[in-house]
From Swiss-Prot:
Family the UniProt entry places it in: Belongs to the universal ribosomal protein uS2 family.
InterPro entries referenced in this protein's UniProt entry, alphabetically: Ribosomal_uS2 (IPR001865), Ribosomal_uS2_bac/mit/plastid (IPR005706), Ribosomal_uS2_CS (IPR018130), Ribosomal_uS2_flav_dom_sf (IPR023591)
Any Pfam family hit: Ribosomal_S2
UniProt name for this protein: Small ribosomal subunit protein uS2
Protein encoded by which gene: rpsB
Gene3D superfamilies: Glucose-6-phosphate isomerase like protein, domain 1 (3.40.50.10490), Helix hairpin bin (1.10.287.610)
Length: 278
């Protein structure tokens, strides 16, 4: 069963591409027709590509790995932040920090700096500083939080990147390509799908279009997370079963030994009684 359907995508306006003069020829396989100078995306292909991407994302989530969502354009910021948070995944909705992937250790240092500020503020270390110094530190903390707050839990490179506008987020895509990180992307008719591993041809300018596609993908990721949780519970239960079995066996051995000792004691008593009678 498909994660989404033609009518849902049509209602969300996923089929609207860009003006013909702005098109990228590499998107030709995904274009259905031209209407009033605007390219119309083939939604049947979009449905198939959403299913393909959703299944891959489900497996990534099931394996316990992270997917980094990227959307710095105004129309997609809020919806991406909400959907990514719903599956406990990191996201970037402000300016893409240069070297976010290729220079990840430096980014981690900045995140740790933010954590250190929080720790020192909580334990009262900064209470002896002047108001001006405290204000400077607070501003620095706010700046770091705005850019890196949503990736604070990302302790290692993500296993995949999910990009809303591959042309706008071209730096992020290039960094991922350089490191061999798979890229999922909503690709409009004016963009180049060449360096995108999982192409989802659709309107990347309409909030509703982005939301519908993310709904399908995140639903698949939730399934993956739930399956991972269920497997973990089963493994823990399986691990406890042999242990309990061993305990029962030991208890049985103790009972057998007690019975044997009782029998031997009874025999000894009978033997002594026979001696006395004799």
């Amino acid at each position: 069963m498909s994660r989404t359907n033609f009518d849902t995508l049509l209602e969300a306006g996923c089929h609207f591409g860009h003006l013909k003069r702005k098109w990228n020829p590499a998107m030709a396989p995904y274009i259905f027709m031209e209407r009033n100078g605007i390219h119309i995306i083939d939604l049947h292909k979009t449905v198939a590509k959403v299913d393909e991407a959703a299944e891959a994302l489900k497996q990534i989530a099931k394996s316990g790995k992270k997917v980094l969502f990227v959307a710095t354009k105004k129309q997609a910021k809020q919806v991406v932040a909400e959907k990514a948070a719903s599956v406990n995944m990191p996201y970037v909705i402000e300016r893409w920090p240069g070297g976010m992937l290729t220079n990840f250790p430096t980014i981690r240092k900045a995140v740790k700096k933010m954590t250190t500020i929080d720790k020192l503020t909580a334990d009262g270390t900064y209470s002896n500083l002047s108001k001006r110094e405290i204000l400077q530190i607070s501003r620095q903390r706010a700046k770091l939080d705005k850019t890196l707050g949503s990736i604070a839990d990302l302790t290692r490179l993500p296993s995949a990147l999910f990009v809303i506008d591959v042309m706008k987020e071209n730096i992020a895509v290039r960094e991922a390509n350089r490191l061999g990180i798979p890229v999922f992307g909503i690709v409009d008719t004016n963009s180049d799908p060449t360096n995108i591993d999982f192409v989802i041809p659709a309107n990347d300018d309409a909030t509703k279009s982005v939301e519908v596609i993310l709904d399908a993908c995140c639903a698949a990721m939730i399934e993956g997370l739930e399956e991972r949780k269920a497997e973990k519970i089963d493994m823990e239960a399986a691990g406890e079963a042999p242990a309990n079995k061993g305990k029962k066996k030991s208890a049985k051995a103790r009972l057998d030994k007690s019975d044997e000792e009782a029998i031997n004691a009874a025999k000894a008593a009978a033997f002594l009684k026979e001696d006395e009678e004799a």
